[in-house]
Amino acid sequence: DLVQNTASCPQGCGSFTRGLNGGGQASPSYFSTINSFNYDSLGNAVDFGDLSQARRLMAAFGDTQRGCWAGGITPSANVNTIDFITIASAGTATDFGDLNEVKDSPQSGSDSHQGLEEFFPRAPELYSPTGKVLPSGGGVGDIGIFAGGNGTSNIIQFITIASTGNAVDFGDKTVGVFSPGGLGSTVRAVFAGGEDPSANVDTIDYVEFRSKGNAADFGNLTAARRALA
């Protein structure tokens, strides 16, 4: 069992040995709790610490040393906060910086080395005062990227996981969408589907982590849809 019943929209990240689950909601309450569990032993999660804010629908991502939570929604507003923790050391999350846009329900992803936001944020499920929602993200090496959001955002942002600081501009998606899906490899991040917002779209576009710039067309989904896992 988790330390706290956060049935609605918590987000998780981890290392090779430890998994972390943070935030979430059990209506009407929002939580900041970070749960910790080790992969090699069965049993209940233990209290790791707390996020800086009680919230849900964040993006979560990390490398082998750090875990990060970005964006999300509190009981009163969408936020652009990025928190981080050191996975090996329990404690309260520390400020990393801010997203360029306020977003909830981002996507995230990372490889086994270092990736940002997101083991890819869900809903799709990966950024500031504009109240963006449902971005997607991916990461490789020490870079994590985020894209999309409410208001049909086409903005792609990135951060460097090993340091701290605000997210910066990476480029633009080929189409502005809400609630796309995100995935990636060690070379590319791919964004699929979403809502524009009058209708779902079937667009798939991609960027390469090492080459900042606008996304390029990859192809199309078999059906137009949003909130892909």
Task: Label every model-predicted segment.
Residues 1-229:
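Polar, enzyme-active/binding microenvironments
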